[in-house]
Structures are given as structure tokens and as C-alpha cells.
């Protein structure tokens, strides 16, 4: 799954109506009212503000007075298809005087949201296994050289009589250490979520 790194705002105009879409990093559904009000301040006097958000298993959408099915549910489907979560999309629509009809209105809302989504910058959310290892300084130097090639990262390192390191990667870290003849103690610490720029 990917999540926005920063807010992205895009605008399209169709038959004198303006559609301003906001893609917003969003991690807490309790913050919805605050974010929604902020968008309304950024785009005052818009006629409607349909929205959708996904945070984990929580999904919510609304059309804010637009004809049913014009935007919100379609935003959710698009976000799911594109693998986007922890995100809020809100489109401020300024009516230009010409009715678009429901099919064109739906397409235009989707086009505006897709533009904000497709041009956004993202983090990839991944779960990594954590392991605590105790190393000699020689083992540390060997591991520091080979670990990145196997996708293993040093998350925390303490230097003392020996080196204590917290490594993140996949389940193969213990066997990788054995392959390198690193025989220090290796203890699993669980999992951690990481964000990587994409």
C-alpha cells in the first residue's frame, strides 16, 4: 500500500465549472472534520465538497449534496484500485452555470481526483521484521558491507565492548547471519512498519 508524502492540489475546468481536488495524507479518522473544514477555507464559496478517505480498514465517503454516486464512492474505488491508503481526497466544485449531467459530472470528479492522485508523491508502507543482534566489531564490519545487498537495514546501533544492533528485513535475517559466519545472539523483536519513498 502507498500513502501520500505531502498534500497535492490539482484543478480542472469543464464548461465553466471548476473542480479543485486535494489529496491529503490522513492517518486518523477523528481528524476528518478539521481537515474537511480546512479544505473549505482553502476553497471558499465552492458549491460542493465531496470526499473519501481510507485509513486501515476504515473507509468513508460522501457527495456533499451532489447527485448520489457522483463522487465519493467512486473515489474510494479509485483509491483501492491504485493501492492508496491513509489518504483523504476532497474536491471543491464551483458550479459554472451549465449543468454537466450525471455521467459527465461523475467523469469530471474522477478526472480531477485522478489528477491529484496520479501526480502525488508517495511512501510505500511495508512491514519489516526486527531482530536484535550482538556482534564483534569484525562481524559488524562484515555485516555492514553485506546487509544492504540483502535488503537488511541497521535501525539502531550501540557501540560498547561489543556492537548491539537492531536490524530490519525479512524472516531470513538469522540464516543470512549464519551464511556470513556471524554467530552472535540473534533475537526476534517483532515487526515494524516502514515508509519508503517511491
Where are these regions (language model features)?
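C-terminal regulatory domains involved in ligand/effector binding and gene-expression control
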Residues: 1-70, 156, 181-198
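Terminal alpha-helical anchor/extension segments at protein ends
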Residues: 106-118, 132-134, 183-198
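Helix N-cap motif at beta-to-alpha junctions
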Residues: 28-30, 136-139, 168-175
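Structural motif
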Residues: 22, 50-51, 86-89, 132
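Active-site beta-strand/loop microenvironment that shapes enzyme catalytic pockets
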Residues: 74-118
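Non-DNA-binding regulatory cores of transcription-related proteins
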Residues: 153-171
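Short glycine-/aliphatic-rich beta-strand segments at the starts of folded cytosolic domains
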Residues: 122-137
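Short amphipathic alpha-helix segments
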Residues: 134-152, 176
Amino acid at each position: 500500500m502507498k500513502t501520500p508524502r505531502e498534500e497535492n492540489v490539482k484543478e480542472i475546468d469543464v464548461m465553466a465549472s471548476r473542480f479543485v481536488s486535494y489529496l491529503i495524507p490522513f492517518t486518523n479518522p477523528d481528524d476528518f472534520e478539521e481537515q474537511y473544514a480546512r479544505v473549505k477555507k482553502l476553497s471558499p464559496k465552492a458549491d460542493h465538497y465531496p470526499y473519501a478517505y481510507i485509513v486501515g480498514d476504515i473507509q468513508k465517503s460522501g457527495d456533499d449534496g451532489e447527485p448520489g454516486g457522483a463522487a465519493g464512492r467512486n473515489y474510494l474505488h479509485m483509491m483501492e484500485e491504485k493501492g492508496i491508503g491513509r489518504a483523504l481526497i476532497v474536491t471543491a466544485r464551483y458550479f459554472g452555470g451549465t449543468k454537466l449531467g450525471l455521467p459527465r459530472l461523475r467523469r469530471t470528479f474522477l478526472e480531477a481526483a485522478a489528477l491529484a492522485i496520479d501526480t502525488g508523491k508517495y511512501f510505500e508502507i511495508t512491514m519489516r521484521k526486527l531482530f536484535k543482534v550482538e556482534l564483534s566489531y569484525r562481524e559488524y564490519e562484515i555485516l555492514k558491507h553485506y546487509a544492504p545487498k540483502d535488503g537488511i537495514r541497521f535501525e539502531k546501533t550501540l557501540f560498547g565492548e561489543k556492537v548491539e544492533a537492531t536490524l530490519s528485513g525479512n524472516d531470513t535475517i538469522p540464516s543470512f547471519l549464519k551464511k556470513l559466519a556471524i554467530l552472535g545472539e540473534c533475537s526476534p523483536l517483532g515487526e515494524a512498519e516502514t515508509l519508503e519513498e517511491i
